[in-house]
């Protein structure tokens, strides 16, 4: 069997598994968020934080709760990192102490579900910070995204009310009923596949074949690895992330990790369909995600299997930066889905990809990570795209656009349009400023188009809350830690505020009855329209800078 055939079968097996869990997992998440019963542990949590689970929140109150919780989380994680040298289970190397700028960047990164890492995990963060700080944020940052998605869906489903649910209920339920049990199952599977789980510090020293001494780091990796993927977080316990054999030792664990980072995001459209009372609507959103993901994955595997140069031509593919235990095709699947979602974990070196392969990782993020996107964020981003598509279709036929019985008035389209302007502005302004400052250009290890691609990738990853990197850029500087931290904050919370405002606007409306002029939003034509609008929006926005970066490199 050729490696290409094996890679196609690898991808198909993932598609079959995701299709198999789509209905049961989507229905389960619907029951979680629609249930009126509270677990005992949940009631204890409500009392501890002083939340009334029976109280509903309008969009403003919901947004303030999201921002307040996230701000407290950033402060806690920031302080925990700076104090870790005085806490148990810390690393003994004084050189690993965090600077305030790096601690800020890391705290923001994990709270925003980005998991951008400007440090080497195994030599910087102690086990207590990994468990009580980073792993906890892997759970709750994902739960925040899911909560916002549920609030937006309620805005579409409800009528004549300004209430979107209760953030604290959504947050705790998402963490305890969905993410925690699934991550336990995932961790057990990963441990059985060879991922390590221990409390060993840097006290294991072995002799290498050359006679030198080498320190082998350990830690509670499997438990963090499971939620890292499941919550589309992506921050690695080790610097090499999922390319490290302690995090991802075999092809089987590689398959499991790709499945984990995709399963919730691909199942949420089913939850959406159940909540709005039309499973066909959920199926249409899923179809858009599947079409875009299939196109992207096909191109990624094609570009990585056809590389120029003596060695790649002899080997038959681009093997630089690829772990041989996975191979080019399986690594391409991982790279594609980690950038289509907001995960950002890597099992290969994206900076070593072909110019067009690297272009695909950039393009996937610039799509807004909607196919399927991050847990929660992918769904609400796709639904905003659906709103824009309905508006464009309404302009074409001269009718007032409606989506799920809700009219799209000037207020709604302004919010939706602003939503899709935020991230491109963050990415393009950040890249332009970095390229304009001579001191920041010194951090580029490559010149020319690839150097531009590295800077563009950094701000694209931060602004879209992905976290992966073209690692040929020195970003552990005060300027980059601060600038990328701001990009992550604005890229996460400005869209959330706009989405919640849009949800509140929809929730206050009544339901408009369908008429002969209503655009059907559950048919293949609508799937094609949303797909086209998504691709056109990205092409118009980012094509000029992509032409200067990866496209120019590919032509050269």
From Swiss-Prot:
It is a multi-pass membrane protein. The chain crosses the membrane at residues 6-26, 65-85, 133-153, 176-196, 249-269, 283-303, 378-398, 419-439, 483-503, 526-546. Disulfide bonds: none annotated. GO terms for molecular function: P-type potassium transmembrane transporter activity; potassium ion binding. It is found in: Cell membrane. Keywords: Cell membrane, Ion transport, Membrane, Potassium, Potassium transport, Transmembrane, Transmembrane helix, Transport. One of its GO terms (cellular component) is plasma membrane. The keyword Magnesium does not apply. It holds the Pfam family KdpA. The keyword Oxidoreductase does not apply. InterPro entries: KdpA. Its main location: membrane. Part of the high-affinity ATP-driven potassium transport (or Kdp) system, which catalyzes the hydrolysis of ATP coupled with the electrogenic transport of potassium into the cytoplasm. This subunit binds the extracellular potassium ions and delivers the ions to the membrane domain of KdpB through an intramembrane tunnel. The system is composed of three essential subunits: KdpA, KdpB and KdpC. Belongs to the KdpA family. This is Potassium-transporting ATPase potassium-binding subunit. It comes from Mycobacterium sp. (strain JLS). The lineage of its organism: Bacteria, Bacillati, Actinomycetota, Actinomycetes, Mycobacteriales. The gene is kdpA.
């Amino acid at each position: 069997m050729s490696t290409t055939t094996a890679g196609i079968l690898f991808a198909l097996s993932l598609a079959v598994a995701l299709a198999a869990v789509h209905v049961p997992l989507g229905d389960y998440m619907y029951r979680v968020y629609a249930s009126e019963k509270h677990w005992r542990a949940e009631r204890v949590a409500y009392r501890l934080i002083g939340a009334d689970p029976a109280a509903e929140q309008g969009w403003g109150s919901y947004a303030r709760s999201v921002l307040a919780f996230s701000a407290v989380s950033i402060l806690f994680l920031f302080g925990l990192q700076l104090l870790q040298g005085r806490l148990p289970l810390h690393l003994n190397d004084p050189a690993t102490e965090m600077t305030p700028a790096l601690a800020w960047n890391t705290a923001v990164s994990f709270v925003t579900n980005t998991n951008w890492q400007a440090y080497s995990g195994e030599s910087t963060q102690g086990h207590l910070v990994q468990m009580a700080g980073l792993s906890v944020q892997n759970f709750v940052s994902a739960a925040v995204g899911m909560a916002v998605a549920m609030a937006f869906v309620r805005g579409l489903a409800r009528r004549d009310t300004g209430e979107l649910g209760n953030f604290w209920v959504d947050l705790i339920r998402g963490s305890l009923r969905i993410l925690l049990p699934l991550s336990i199952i995932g961790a057990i599977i990963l441990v059985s596949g060879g991922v390590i789980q221990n409390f060993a510090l840097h006290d294991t020293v072995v002799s290498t074949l050359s006679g030198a001494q080498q320190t082998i780091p350990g830690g509670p990796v499997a438990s963090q690895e499971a939620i890292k993927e499941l919550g589309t977080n992506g921050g690695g316990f080790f610097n090499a992330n999922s390319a490290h054999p302690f995090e991802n030792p075999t092809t089987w664990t590689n398959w499991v990790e790709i499945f984990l980072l995709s399963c919730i995001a691909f199942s949420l459209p089913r939850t959406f369909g159940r909540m709005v009372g039309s499973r066909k609507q959920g199926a249409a959103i899923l179809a858009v995600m599947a079409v875009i993901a299939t196109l992207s994955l096909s191109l990624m595997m094609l570009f990585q299997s056809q590389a120029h140069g003596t060695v790649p031509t002899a080997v038959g593919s681009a093997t630089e930066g690829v772990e041989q235990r996975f191979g080019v095709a399986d690594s391409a699947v991982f790279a594609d889905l980690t950038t289509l979602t907001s995960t950002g974990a890597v099992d290969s070196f994206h900076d070593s990809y072909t110019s067009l392969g690297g272009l695909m990782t950039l393009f996937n993020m610039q799509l807004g990570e909607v196919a399927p996107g991050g847990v929660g964020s992918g769904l609400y981003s796709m639904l905003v795209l659906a709103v824009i598509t309905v508006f464009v279709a309404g302009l074409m036929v001269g009718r007032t656009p409606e989506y799920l019985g809700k009219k799209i008035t000037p207020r709604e389209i302004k919010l939706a349009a602003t939503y899709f302007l935020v991230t491109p502005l963050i990415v393009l302004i950040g890249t332009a400023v970095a390229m304009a400052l001579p001191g920041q250009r010194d951090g580029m290890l490559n010149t020319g188009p690839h150097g531009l691609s590295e800077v563009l990738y950094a701000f694209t990853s931060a602004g879209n809350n992905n976290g992966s990197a073209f690692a040929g850029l020195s970003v552990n500087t005060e300027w980059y830690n601060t600038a990328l931290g701001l990009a992550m904050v604005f890229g996460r919370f400005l869209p959330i505020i706009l989405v919640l405002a849009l949800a509140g606007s929809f929730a206050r409306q009544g339901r408009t009855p369908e008429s002969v002029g209503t655009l059907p939003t559950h048919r293949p034509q609508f799937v094609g329209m949303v797909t086209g609008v998504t691709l056109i929006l990205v092409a118009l926005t980012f094509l000029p800078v992509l032409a200067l970066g990866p496209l120019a490199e590919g032509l050269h």
